[in-house]
Amino acid sequence: MSFVESWRSVGPRRRRQVTPGPVTRSVYSDYTQGNSWSEDGDEGCDQVARDLRAEFSARASSESKRAPLLPRIGDGSPVLPDKRNGIFPATAAKRTQARRWPIQALSILCSLLFAVLLAFLLAIAYLIVKELHTENSKNEDVVDTGLLGFWSLLIISLTAGLSCCSFSWTVTYFDSFEPGMFPPTPLSPARFKKLTGHSFHMGYSMAILNGVVAALTVAWCLM
């Protein structure tokens, strides 16, 4: 009895395994007949396409809310910014500006302090020269006797010349792409000489010339 019962239980299992056979043949027959895409398949593809479109539209709307609006051309298409090495130039410019603004502020502050110091020194020199001019005396032979000696005149004129030269050189330094040399000389550095092709820098040469002219002018006025 046990053998017969086991044979009966195995029989339906075999039938269950054999039953999908005709279904597969019908499917293959449908493909051979050219009906590869049925109505159910079309509906499934349409559903997938709708889901993808909804996802893309949701992403586009979220990105448009987060990102600023791009300018558009005449046909309505947006103008995309240029991208170099994975970085947009606007982003790189903002980063460099954020890094350089402390240096620029410090340079402006140093320039203002230098200008104030120079103005203070020139004001003191003007007061000294004015006081010395009023103290000029005449002797009994009606000969003008100046209280300024040679060394005093030389020191005052050199101070005025160096102050004017330093101020001109500082202005040229901040306004030129060539950093120049220190102490200030009219010669350009070797690496910039290869780029520009000339060994003299006109800006620094004019700064030194301004100092010389200022020294000569002060000496001429005090003599």
UniProtKB/Swiss-Prot annotation:
GO CC list: nuclear inner membrane
InterPro entries, per database record: ARL6IP6
Stretches with biased composition (Polar residues): 26-38
Key word Ribosomal protein present: no
Spans annotated as Disordered: 1-44
Residues annotated as transmembrane: 108-128, 142-162, 202-222
Record's subcellular location: Nucleus inner membrane
Bilayer topology annotation: Multi-pass membrane protein
Signal peptide limits: none
Keywords: Membrane, Nucleus, Phosphoprotein, Transmembrane, Transmembrane helix
Domain of life (superkingdom): Eukaryota
Residues carrying Phosphoserine: 2, 36, 57, 62, 77
Family: Belongs to the ARL6IP6 family.
Protein's name in the database: ADP-ribosylation factor-like protein 6-interacting protein 6
